[in-house]
Amino acid sequence: MAELTIRPEEIRDALENFVQSYKPDAASREEVGTVTLAGDGIAKVEGLPSAMANELLKFEDGTLGLALNLEEREIGCVVLGEFSGIEEGQPVSRTGEVLSVAVAEGYLGRVVDPLGNPIDGLGEIETSGRRALELQAPTVMQRKSVHEPMETGYKAVDAMTPIGRGQRQLIIGDRQTGKTALAVDTIINQRDNWRTGDPNKQVRCIYVAIGQKGSTIASVRGALEENGALEYTTIVAAPASDPAGFKYLAPYTGSAIGQQWMYEGKHVLIIFDDLSKQADAYRAVSLLLRRPPGREAYPGDVFYLHSRLLERCAKLSDAEGAGSMTGLPIVETKANDVSAFIPTNVISITDGQCFLESDLFNAGQRPALNVGISVSRVGGSAQHKAMKQVSGRLRVDLAQFRELEAFAAFGSDLDAASKSQLERGQRMVELLKQNQYQPMSTEDQVVSVWAGTTGKMDEVPVADIRRFEKELLEYLHRQEQGLMTSIREGGKMSDDTLQAVAEAIAAFKKQFETSDGKLLGEDAPSAAK
C-alpha cells in the first residue's frame, strides 16, 4: 500500500485559490404582501412597505395592479384587468416598475388596449422601446409658439376657430351633437398630407376611446378604414365594459405613444373621446379607495388629472426636434351647461373651445357650432394666410345676422339694408353646412367663404346654395386647376388672384341652373351689395 503523503503547501494554495475565486450567491430579496380587501376593481394590500407611488404590483394569477394610495399600514391599488380571481389572503409582489407602454411605428393602423396590447386580432406589434405613462410635460423653454395650421376640413371651424399644431382645442357639447364626427373628420382630413410622404406635412393620429360602446368604437374604426385614414391612426380603446382603472389610464397611454413620436420630430394629433368619462372613472376609483370627495363627489386632484394630461400637447422648439402634438379633448355637457365642474376645468386648461349646440344640431346646422362662445386663443396665428384674409368679417357678420334674425322674428318691417343682410346671413349659414366624412381642402374652403362673404352668391336661391357650391368647386378644379393650386400653396391672395376667382365665379354663374329651371342672370334679382 502506497504511503499517503500530506503536503501542507498544496492544501494552503488550494484554499487560497478557493477563497479568492469564491463569489457568494446574493440572497434573493422579494417583498411579498397580502390582499386584505378585494372587490369593485380595487384591492387593499398589506406588507409592501417599500412600494412606490404608481408602481405596478403583481397578483397571484398574474393580474397587474397600480398602487395609488400609499397609507401607513396598507396600499390601495386599482386592478388592471379582471378582478374576479383576486381574493383576500392571496400573495402580492412588487415589480419595481412604474406603469409604461411600448412605443413603435407599428402602432399605426392598430387597435390597442390601455396597456398597449393589440386587441384587433392582427398579431403582435413590433416595439422599439417603452415609455412611462407619467412623464413631465415639455418645459416653457422646450416649447415654441403655435404657428402651423392643423386643418379640420370644416369651413366653420377653420375659418372662425382655427386650430394650430401643438394647440389644445376643446370640443364640447351635449350628447348627439356631432363631437366625435368633428374629431373623426379631422383625422380623415389629414389623408392628403399623409400621402405626400413629406414628414413635415404628415400627421400621425391617435384616437382614444374612453367608456364608449364597443359598437361605437368599431364604427369609428370602420369609418377611418373606409376613408383611407386607418393607416396613419392608432386607436386606444377602453370601452364601457372595461374596469374603471382602464378608462382612467387610456388617455395617458395614447399620450405616451404620441409623445414618443413628438420627441422624434414628428407631428401628432390626439383625440380624447371623452374626458368626462375618464373623470367619472377616476371618481369611482377614488371613492372606492376612500379618498375624500369634493365638488360633485370628484376627488380634489381631478383638475390635475386633466391638466397634466393636456399640458403634454405642445409645439416643440427647433432644438427639441420641432415636433408637435395637437390635442382635441372632448367633453360632454348636460343641457348645454358649460359651467359644470369638468367643463370649466377643461376650458381653463385648453387654448380654446368649439361649442356644439343641440338646438343648432336639431335645426339641421351641421356642424352645430355656436359661433358666439366658440373661440380659438392661439390658432389665429397658425391660420392659412388666404383663409385669414377672407374670413376676417365672417364671425361678426354671423353674429349680426343672429341678432337681426331674432329681431325679425317679431315681424317688424325691415329696411332694404337689413333685409339684404338677413338674406346674405341665411346663405352663409347654409354655406357653412357640411356632411359627415366630407372634409374640404383649404383652397375649396377659401373660395367658398370668399364667395359667400363678398356677395357672389346673393342671387343664388338659399335652397340651391350647397349644390351651387359643389358644382362651382368642381368647375374650378376642372377649368382653373392652376388657380386653385396657387391658392393652396401661396400665402395671402393678391388682387390678381381675387380678380381671377371673381371672373371664374361669374363665368360659372352664367351656366348654373337653379332648382326651378332658371339660369342665373336671367330674370334674377340684382345682388344687394
From Swiss-Prot:
<dbReference type="GO" id="GO:0045259">
    <property type="term" value="C:proton-transporting ATP synthase complex"/>
</dbReference>
<keyword id="KW-0813">Transport</keyword>
<dbReference type="InterPro" id="IPR000793">
    <property type="entry name" value="ATP_synth_asu_C"/>
</dbReference>
<keyword id="KW-0406">Ion transport</keyword>
<keyword id="KW-1278">Translocase</keyword>
<dbReference type="InterPro" id="IPR033732">
    <property type="entry name" value="ATP_synth_F1_a_nt-bd_dom"/>
</dbReference>
<dbReference type="InterPro" id="IPR027417">
    <property type="entry name" value="P-loop_NTPase"/>
</dbReference>
<dbReference type="Pfam" id="PF02874">
    <property type="entry name" value="ATP-synt_ab_N"/>
</dbReference>
<keyword id="KW-0067">ATP-binding</keyword>
<dbReference type="GO" id="GO:0043531">
    <property type="term" value="F:ADP binding"/>
</dbReference>
<keyword id="KW-0066">ATP synthesis</keyword>
<dbReference type="InterPro" id="IPR036121">
    <property type="entry name" value="ATPase_F1/V1/A1_a/bsu_N_sf"/>
</dbReference>
<dbReference type="Pfam" id="PF00006">
    <property type="entry name" value="ATP-synt_ab"/>
</dbReference>
<dbReference type="GO" id="GO:0046933">
    <property type="term" value="F:proton-transporting ATP synthase activity, rotational mechanism"/>
</dbReference>
<comment type="function">
    <text>Produces ATP from ADP in the presence of a proton gradient across the membrane. The alpha chain is a regulatory subunit.</text>
</comment>
<keyword id="KW-0375">Hydrogen ion transport</keyword>
<keyword id="KW-0472">Membrane</keyword>
<comment type="subunit">
    <text>F-type ATPases have 2 components, CF(1) - the catalytic core - and CF(0) - the membrane proton channel. CF(1) has five subunits: alpha(3), beta(3), gamma(1), delta(1), epsilon(1). CF(0) has three main subunits: a(1), b(2) and c(9-12). The alpha and beta chains form an alternating ring which encloses part of the gamma chain. CF(1) is attached to CF(0) by a central stalk formed by the gamma and epsilon chains, while a peripheral stalk is formed by the delta and b chains.</text>
</comment>
<dbReference type="GO" id="GO:0005524">
    <property type="term" value="F:ATP binding"/>
</dbReference>
<dbReference type="InterPro" id="IPR000194">
    <property type="entry name" value="ATPase_F1/V1/A1_a/bsu_nucl-bd"/>
</dbReference>
<dbReference type="GO" id="GO:0005886">
    <property type="term" value="C:plasma membrane"/>
</dbReference>
<comment type="similarity">
    <text>Belongs to the ATPase alpha/beta chains family.</text>
</comment>
<dbReference type="InterPro" id="IPR023366">
    <property type="entry name" value="ATP_synth_asu-like_sf"/>
</dbReference>
<dbReference type="InterPro" id="IPR005294">
    <property type="entry name" value="ATP_synth_F1_asu"/>
</dbReference>
<dbReference type="InterPro" id="IPR004100">
    <property type="entry name" value="ATPase_F1/V1/A1_a/bsu_N"/>
</dbReference>
<keyword id="KW-1003">Cell membrane</keyword>
<dbReference type="InterPro" id="IPR038376">
    <property type="entry name" value="ATP_synth_asu_C_sf"/>
</dbReference>
<keyword id="KW-0547">Nucleotide-binding</keyword>
<feature type="site" description="Required for activity">
    <location>
        <position position="374"/>
    </location>
</feature>
<dbReference type="Pfam" id="PF00306">
    <property type="entry name" value="ATP-synt_ab_C"/>
</dbReference>
<feature type="binding site">
    <location>
        <begin position="173"/>
        <end position="180"/>
    </location>
    <ligand>
        <name>ATP</name>
    </ligand>
</feature>
<dbReference type="InterPro" id="IPR020003">
    <property type="entry name" value="ATPase_a/bsu_AS"/>
</dbReference>
<keyword id="KW-0139">CF(1)</keyword>
<protein>
    <recommendedName>
        <fullName>ATP synthase subunit alpha</fullName>
        <ecNumber>7.1.2.2</ecNumber>
    </recommendedName>
</protein>
